[in-house]
Curated annotation (Swiss-Prot):
This is Acyl carrier protein. The gene is acpP. Pathway: Lipid metabolism; fatty acid biosynthesis. GO terms for molecular function: acyl binding; acyl carrier activity; phosphopantetheine binding. NCBIfam families: acyl_carrier, PRK00982.1-2, PRK00982.1-3, PRK00982.1-4, PRK00982.1-5. The keyword Phosphoprotein applies. Carrier of the growing fatty acid chain in fatty acid biosynthesis. Residues 2-77 form the Carrier domain. GO terms for biological process: lipid A biosynthetic process. The modification O-(pantetheine 4'-phosphoryl)serine is found at S37. Keywords: Cytoplasm, Fatty acid biosynthesis, Fatty acid metabolism, Lipid biosynthesis, Lipid metabolism, Phosphopantetheine, Phosphoprotein. It comes from Methylobacterium radiotolerans (strain ATCC 27329 / DSM 1819 / JCM 2831 / NBRC 15690 / NCIMB 10815 / 0-1). GO terms for cellular component: cytosol; membrane. PROSITE patterns: CARRIER, PHOSPHOPANTETHEINE. It is found in: Cytoplasm.
Amino acid sequence: MSDIAERVKKIVVEHLGVEPEKVVESANFIDDLGADSLDTVELVMAFEEEFNVEIPDDAAETIQTVGDAVKFLEKNSAA
């Protein structure tokens, strides 16, 4: 697992209070991890802060799984 993936996993565990083993690439934030729309906004904000990147609203709407977040951040962050 990449450094970015590990950091994403840590943020998801902290913000959603889920077991680390549930945070897999295919896990959907809402359907699999129990997030609501406010949780997803807070996750995006946490990703922006952790990775020093701005995630536009249209991109944020496409980030629905852990893997989506990792792919976006690998492509767009300098961290």
